Amino acid sequence: MNERQVVCYDVCIYTAMLSRFKVFLKKSMPLNETIKHHGLIIRVAIPSPLRRVFDYLPPIVEQLSIKPGMRVRVPFGKREVVGVVVESAQDSTLLPNRLKSIGTVLDREPLFSSALFRTLLWAAAYYQHPIGEVFQTALPVKLRSTEPVKVDTTVYRVLIPLDGDISTSLKQAKKQKSLLELIESEFEVNENRIKNAGYSRRTLNQLMEKNLVKRYMVASERAAKFKPPTSASELQLPLNDAQKVAVKTILKSSDSYACYLLDGVTGSGKTEVYMQLIQHQLANGRQCLVLVPEIGLTPQTVSRFRERFTCPVVVMHSGLSDAARLDAWNHSREGSAAITIGTRSAVFAPLANPGMIIVDEEHDTSFKQQDGFRYSARDLAVMRAKKENVPVILGSATPSLESLQNCKANKFKHLRLGERAGVAQPPTLELVDISQSILESGFSEQLLFKIQKQLNANNQVLVFINRRGFAPMLTCNSCGWIAECNQCIAQLTVHAKPPGLRCHHCGTIEKLSTSCPTCNSSNLTTLGIGTQKIELFLKKRFPLIPVLRIDGDSIRSRKRFETMLEQINRREPCILLGTQMLTKGHHFPGITLVAVLDADAGLFSADFRGQEQMAQIITQVSGRAGRSDRGGQVVIQSRHAGHQTLQSLVQSTYAEFADFLLKERKNSAMPPFSQLALLRTEAKEMKAAIDFLSSINSISDDLSINKQFEIDRIGPIPAPMEKRAGKFRGQLILKSASRLVMQEFLFQLCQRIEALRAPAGLRWSVDVDPVDLI
């Protein structure tokens, strides 16, 4: 069996290891014996929650040769669905009379290259997810149905083979019989072929009326591949010594797999390194894939790439229409797009001639999908690069502890950019204790003075608070009522524009109350601050200065966001106000002061990654200051200014702080020195969620005793957020020192879970390498 085949069957059929382990694909057969068939069996992955493939016979009417990676329309229960072919075989557990035939072959060739196909198989195995849903995730929405890849050409195919009965029925219709023979002999013909052969439209229509011939829409010819640039761009910047070393080192393996961690302080010129490496790949006719964590980064990134390169650049992210995403997917697959830039799902972009994959801001948790197929785009990018045999670059000023440990283990190559590029100097950091201060909408007088000083000098200021909305809480001063989401165990956030109460967890929107629903008092007040409330305060405090709020609420319009970016890049005095979105890779050379209003949230997080993420956010947002010759300063407000974590961040580098955290993780045997998996249930009642997890826990006991798996377990327990979107949530956390052991354990566990009868309305999921345990 070759590597393009999925060696899987029936219930949960895969097991796999991370990059340093070989992927083992096991064939798990049901208890009944397999039956040898004289003809071919086609195994199809269908989008369903079942971890298995399904056996079909080839189409009744001979069509194009069927290959792995092609879409087919098949009967599934009482409906027809679109699946993806994964392999052909000679045996099945089903008797011949129980097998159904494939209805239609939808593609002329596989939609996935061999390398991408194998990456998807690895992903289904590693993340313990149904293979049919994995393939569906990898396809644009329009290709998840019967839509052809590119609709342009009408063709005609025979529906029923020309046998004796058909031949007899057409004995008096010689033209129809002759045309039917032509179409059958060539499999499919277009209208020009029919016309040139001397047949009329009337004859063709008669065959279609008799259901002997059917019309299909198929893909047009491929677009021409991009033309490689013949010279370097005039916009190419000179490199410093560290950048030169990075470029030279990576180019040594420019035509083979290697994973590099480009660890550069903010403003060190990582993007220029990317671009010069891309220039080399484009000159050799190879495509490049660039992943960014947020849609908000895409306009700025795309603009810089299009200014720099004359070759076509396409964009792929969830903000595009289905038609636009399919168009970008086609250009990438055909090789007419030189550079594909996108967010998480762009890791599945097909590349005709791949040359390099870049993951910018590799530490960002946005690269991990939080529902459905819970994959990490960063980790998939590394595995895909390995399958494609191309280099992959993970860039960050605050690398994840996982990537740093992979460097220490010699799995990744560590390249450092320790100085800012050009004349830019690192900003100065100041920690301000506000525990005894009287604040005005979250600002100390000391901070307001510094803001005014920078604005008077015609500079720009960035104010950071990781809380969107107007205020995080609406409460009644008379009885203590608090506005809570009736679908979640969470408070509703007050929003001023548009006015209302919103749940940031499930999306519930309610009208803004004018009186307390408990005691009817009108004595309601908002507590806490969010970006909208701060925006109003800053506009009143600095009435002549533009205040640009950049958060998930304000940038829903791409045009509005691009307008704000243009205004910022003019380097006129303004105040940027935003959430975590502003910390990610933006280059704003006019900013000389960064203000962090509240740095305390990550200090007391229930998540073991809380301190790492807090350090990354503060370091990243601090890096927005001083990116030109004007210098910069960072003011961090805290009620716990003496806390060891904050003191370490201010007095040392991120690298030193990360080393400290790695030692803590090693001592506590937490990732990256172990592997976690999260089993979660959602049900209408908490009892049902916990009871089902208890059944899973009993299976785990049995596996641990009989198979000698060393797996630590926490739970079953209610999730920290017990109710979300109307469902009660329970969880069971698994931990193992060995990925090999964890994968084999999950493989067998998922088999047995699928054999359980889950209560109506209950859903269960497995999250391998979870980044959110809340």
Q: What are the residue ranges of the model-derived segments?
A:
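Inter-lobe coupling/hinge segments of SF2-like helicase ATPases
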Residues: 234-240, 244-247, 256-690, 717-722, ...
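Accessory, non-ATPase domains that flank or precede helicase/AAA+ motor cores in DNA-metabolism machines
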Residues: 2-396, 408-424, 706, 733, ...
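Non-catalytic terminal extensions of ATP-dependent helicases
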Residues: 8-140, 185-186, 196-200, 254-262, ...
